Amino acid sequence: MAQSGASKNGKNQGKGGKSSAGGRQSVAAARRSSPGNNRTQLIIGGIAIVVIIAIVVFGVVLNRQQTATQAEGYGASTQSVATASADGVVTVTKPGSTPKATIDVYEDALCPACAELERQFGQQINQQLDNGNLTVNYHMVDFLNRSSHSGDYSSRAAGALLCVAQDSGAQPGVYMALHSALFAPENQPAENGSTDLSNQQLADLAKTAGASDQAQTCISTGANTQAAATAAATFMTNLGTITGGRAGTPTVIYNGAPVTLNSDWLTKLVG
């Protein structure tokens, strides 16, 4: 309708009106089609494209660096052992070592971001444990029980790790092997998924990790599920205090403060 109105006004103005409108259009057209102006726009456009490409490439490279698997190829820990305290904290370290850093790790077995932490830094943690540079205190929480199919998967998985720490923790590498297995893509259930792992399946993972028959029985019977749930409640309260009420997983604590999990956080801690 606006175009129709403009056309009628052009007719009423007569030739002068048309000429005036035509003049304005011609100037605008001339500005767009001027050879010199075109070259300038092409140069500016070309520069802009190059800059955009450079930014994209830089972003891709930076993202790869930030999400790359650290110490890729190192594999499992072979020298670390685990001990469970009365309050459910599992401490993993190399016997006889003098670690450069001790960290506290808060995780939920159903947490996708925790699986990403394991993917990116799990092998580096194993390496630093075996080198005697690191001690890790694991605090397994269960606030994602509500998102598991069974309603208590996080507690049961935490209980499984507690069983292994208590009954097979002295066997080098076993605890860390089960820990890694729980976060592996082929094993970790999906949040709000249609299934999760049974106690027997958790026990089978522990068996593959090298856990003793006693540890496997502890897991398959769910012997430590309630103990793990009780510990998890305390862990979440403590984490909330440390983080100012922003408790979440994964969280890594060093010297009483949360660590920013950039690509070199662990390298900086162990020097």
Question: Where does each model-flagged region fall?
Answer:
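A short beta-strand-turn-helix
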Residues: 84-101, 242
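N-terminal carbohydrate-binding/catalytic regions of secreted carbohydrate-active enzymes
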Residues: 43-46, 61-63, 112-115, 119-123
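Extracellular/periplasmic catalytic domains that process cell-envelope and extracellular macromolecules
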Residues: 98, 130-131, 170, 244-246
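Structural alpha/beta surface segment adjacent to cysteine/selenocysteine redox centers
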Residues: 115-196
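Short active-site neighborhood of thiol/selenol oxidoreductases, capturing the structured segment around
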Residues: 97-118, 136, 140
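Mid-domain, small-residue-enriched loop/turn segments at the edges of structured enzyme/sensor domains
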Residues: 198-200
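C-terminal cap of thioredoxin/glutaredoxin-like
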Residues: 2-69, 203-271
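N-terminal hydrophobic targeting segments that direct proteins to the cell envelope
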Residues: 61-87
